[in-house]
């Protein structure tokens, strides 16, 4: 038997807190911070120092039971229960990621993303906030009926109605989880909840007990945990564990923490929480200071065994911890972490591209792992080194994360059945024969223009076509653009609104401006253009262009996407797609207080 020095130090609040407490207790013979770090490094401490710790604990009114800190103690066997080297990946792209401005997805789009997340190997898929709106409930329920391997989860406040809606929504899933939360920081309890700490604990316990009526897999989150008082956190976490919570999530809701503090916080909290060794501890970090991934990794060092993250780091404000960076950090630096995930890393880039296509959020070229430049080398010295031996300048291979995914998919001679089968392989399932026929017709048109069609082309094509399937939408029909040097470009465009054909013309400072003005001359939406961007779907001059348009009106922000080998046609499609969402997709009546954790 051996003492767990890390837990022992954490019991006193961490290295710095312990050093200060020892100095106050015995100023002349106190151990220094450096000495305490050495205890942790060696995994042992002198008997004389152990006696001082015992005396310190007694002076604080909490006698030290050394049996609780023996390595073989039952409370430390969490490693055996949850496989200490196995990290659970909890993907919240469909819930927290969707809270990015304009990133709202349709039910069909969410199902496509969920299928890809299951293919990626995400252990938990947080499909949404079922009580937020009827649309959210339908999407969570549809995903619960679709996903068979991953656990499907719904978020809910610590309110009975929310929890019961979540329970009903995830009911069809073979593996289901309810994730309930309440704020625990002093500022949130006083100003947002207007509740006393005792009331917050009572609400949390009640919430967990109701959730257990629907599933044995219940996660509890302490919103704004990293700004909460740790003794109160230990109390509320202990109470919900006793009530039946199986995962405890500690969110850095406002991205306030820094890595070494995060690690210490987790160590101390786990040590102080009654029955803390009987649950999985989870980290949910936001990126306001650019430290979400670093804090997530630090939490794992501190004892967490679940991380909550999103594809491409998508999320409101500065985003969330990105799943691709966490997974590859654990894989590449296995020598330091010794931790494993169940992620198929070759699906990382396909997942990134799909989420980017559907949400309209392009990936920055220098983004780690999934950026277009992630494996590019401009320096001649670097290029020479990589050619001679890849590992001179690359710590992982492009193929290992799926950059070989530009696979030749289909050709102009491919038939309808081959097309349907390929869509199924990509996780794309169209709801009707009409939708399949429309998508296949678009594919044949594309095949006549483009010799090689890749998986990415099909994702872009289907996303574009699905947006046109709604009868209550703006639908692109055709356009003619006239430009001449020195003259204002003119756009003549034909489009449909609820099946009624409209014609419009306008001139502008450029062809894009002319297209937008022509559409607005009929639509009169009153929206403001926030973002217009164009990206090539694949390489080559005949590649499809994927265009994103972000429109804002009042407090609503929407993204529209269009894809075509003709960039100006893609531009018109994207603008019409955004207008469809703005005009015909009702704004979600979010439940009050249903913000991010």
Curated annotation (Swiss-Prot):
Gene3D superfamilies: 1.10.238.260, 3.30.160.270, Aldolase class I
MF-aspect GO terms: 2-isopropylmalate synthase activity; acetyl-CoA C-acetyltransferase activity; manganese ion binding
EC number: 2.3.3.13
Pathway the protein takes part in: Amino-acid biosynthesis; L-leucine biosynthesis; L-leucine from 3-methyl-2-oxobutanoate: step 1/4
Spans annotated as Regulatory domain: 475-597
Cofactor names: Mn(2+)
Catalytic activity, reaction form: 3-methyl-2-oxobutanoate + acetyl-CoA + H2O = (2S)-2-isopropylmalate + CoA + H(+)
Keyword set, alphabetical order: Amino-acid biosynthesis, Branched-chain amino acid biosynthesis, Cytoplasm, Leucine biosynthesis, Manganese, Metal-binding, Transferase
UniProt-listed GO biological process terms: L-leucine biosynthetic process
Location, primary (coarse class): cytoplasm
Ranges where the record places region Unknown: 1-80
Pfam families: HCS_D2, HMGL-like, LeuA_dimer
Subunit structure: Homodimer.
Task performed by this protein: Catalyzes the condensation of the acetyl group of acetyl-CoA with 3-methyl-2-oxobutanoate (2-ketoisovalerate) to form 3-carboxy-3-hydroxy-4-methylpentanoate (2-isopropylmalate).
Family according to the record: Belongs to the alpha-IPM synthase/homocitrate synthase family. LeuA type 1 subfamily.
Protein name: 2-isopropylmalate synthase
Annotated source species: Neisseria gonorrhoeae (strain ATCC 700825 / FA 1090)
Gene name of the record: leuA
């Amino acid at each position: 038997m051996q003492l767990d020095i890390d837990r022992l130090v954490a019991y006193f609040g961490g290295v710095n807190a312990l050093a200060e407490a020892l100095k106050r207790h015995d100023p002349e013979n106190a151990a220094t911070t450096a000495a305490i770090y050495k205890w942790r490094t060696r995994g042992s401490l002198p008997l004389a120092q152990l006696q001082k710790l015992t005396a310190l604990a007694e002076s604080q009114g909490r006698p030290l039971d050394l049996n609780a800190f023996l390595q073989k103690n039952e409370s430390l066997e969490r490693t055996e229960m949850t496989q200490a080297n196995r990290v659970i990946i909890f993907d919240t792209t469909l819930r927290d990621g969707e809270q990015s401005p304009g990133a709202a997805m349709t039910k069909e789009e969410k199902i496509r993303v969920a299928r890809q997340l299951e293919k990626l190997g995400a252990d938990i898929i947080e499909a949404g906030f079922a009580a937020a709106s009827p649309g959210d409930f339908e999407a969570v329920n549809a995903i619960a009926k679709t996903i068979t391997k991953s656990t499907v989860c719904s978020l809910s406040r610590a309110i009975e109605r929310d929890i019961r809606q979540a329970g009903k929504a995830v009911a069809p899933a073979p593996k289901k989880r309810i994730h309930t939360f309440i704020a625990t920081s002093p500022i949130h309890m006083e100003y947002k909840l207007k509740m006393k700490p005792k009331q917050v604990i009572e609400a949390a316990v009640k919430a967990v007990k109701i959730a257990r009526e629907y599933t044995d897999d219940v996660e509890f989150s302490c919103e704004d945990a990293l700004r909460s008082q740790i003794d109160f956190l230990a109390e509320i976490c202990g109470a919900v564990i006793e009530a039946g919570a199986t995962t405890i999530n500690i969110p850095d809701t406002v991205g306030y923490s820094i890595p070494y503090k995060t690690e210490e916080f987790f160590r101390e909290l786990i040590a102080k929480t009654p029955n803390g060794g009987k649950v999985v501890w989870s980290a949910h970090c936001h990126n306001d200071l650019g430290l979400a991934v670093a804090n997530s990794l630090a939490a794992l060092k501190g004892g967490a065994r679940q991380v909550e993250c999103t594809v491409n780091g998508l999320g409101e404000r500065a985003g969330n911890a990105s799943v691709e960076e966490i997974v590859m950090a654990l894989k590449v630096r296995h020598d330091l972490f010794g931790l494993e995930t169940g992620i198929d890393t070759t699906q990382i880039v396909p997942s990134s591209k799909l989420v980017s296509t559907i949400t309209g959020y392009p990936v920055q070229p220098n983004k780690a792992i999934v950026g277009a430049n992630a494996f590019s080398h401009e320096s001649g010295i670097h290029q020479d080194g990589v050619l001679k031996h890849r590992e001179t300048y690359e710590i992982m291979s492009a193929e290992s994360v799926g950059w070989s995914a530009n696979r030749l998919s289909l050709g102009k001679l491919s038939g309808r059945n081959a097309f349907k089968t390929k869509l199924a392989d990509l996780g794309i399932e169209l709801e009707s024969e009409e939708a399949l026929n429309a998508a296949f017709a678009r594919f044949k048109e594309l095949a006549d223009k483009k010799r090689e069609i890749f998986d990415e082309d099909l994702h872009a094509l289907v996303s574009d076509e699905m947006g046109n399937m709604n009868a209550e939408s703006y639908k692109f029909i055709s356009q003619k653009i006239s430009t001449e040097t020195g003259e204002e470009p003119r756009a003549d465009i034909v489009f449909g609104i609820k099946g009624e054909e409209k014609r419009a013309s306008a001139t502008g400072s450029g062809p894009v401006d002319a297209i937008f003005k022509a559409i607005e001359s009929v639509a009169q939406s009153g929206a403001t253009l926030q973002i217009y961007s164009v990206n090539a779907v694949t390489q080559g001059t005949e590649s499809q262009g994927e265009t994103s348009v972000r429109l804002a009106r009042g407090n609503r922000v929407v993204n529209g996407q269009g894809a075509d080998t003709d960039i100006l046609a893609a531009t018109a499609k994207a603008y019409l797609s955004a207008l469809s969402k703005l005009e015909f997709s009702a704004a979600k009546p979010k439940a009050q207080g249903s913000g991010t954790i």
